[in-house]
């Protein structure tokens, strides 16, 4: 007769939730209660009924998958009353071919009771609100860049090569010329009056670039795109004001993070918005690197370790760290820039930049945890480190050949 395999129970009473946009399927089980599965809607009143049902049955722990934003309304209602364990859906997949809402909630409850679930990081409310602001600002900033690129295409369609003679067509000189093209009769000679003396290109070359064929359609498109850019930049300014208000209590952490080469003020706020200011939620620096997806995955078979891609993690913090790593790689006479140059020869640009991003994350972890500024090692650190290791290696080899061999210590 086949024996039934059960997990050892480590939690007294728990609940597994299968969360969707419109429904929540809940399964409770544990000591002194009968396993039961119920379905609730995601409206607030129904979620309150779910909360009351769980409290009535003495539930202490609740597990649910981090499915998009659908878990947030549930967390808002249950968060103050139960220990919520938010889990990655990839980590709790059931047996293929056996998937229903009821079975999923029962499987989550079973794993929860056995203590087999790894909880995802849920920042405090203030950090979650700051994260919303920073992510929205990032999206709007990209939208502005997209609109500016579209504007350049309209100019190109009108045979105006303004981007070939100005580094930034949205500078003071460029905007004066653009406004005149939109609002006045198009005349290349008159446009030259707006050219500032600091522009490197000659006036004859500039005139050649701005001589084109402008139609009413081009004027309409340019005006509409400019209005879109201005409106979006106004919204970004409002968000910046709100971010400044939200980050007042994190002033010290932001100031210290700015000491990392390539990070800057916006980068420091971005890091705080994703990881928070309490590093006790991460047992050590390896855990935060794993959570962010900034460390290699494990790929070992038959005792051999094979190369593997970086692990899955927080896509937003990963993108931010890569962006900051590019900035750090362009700094002068810094450890991070020399590290990038050292790695890029054997790894290639993409892997090298992820490695530098990993360094920035680890530095950020200790800076926030210990409230200390970044310790700049300098561009010579790596070469000196390799030199010292090489000297130590040759000393060891020589002493193996001649145990009584002594070395003189050179005094600088």
What are these regions (language model features)?
Residues 1-412:
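A detector of single, family-specific signature residues
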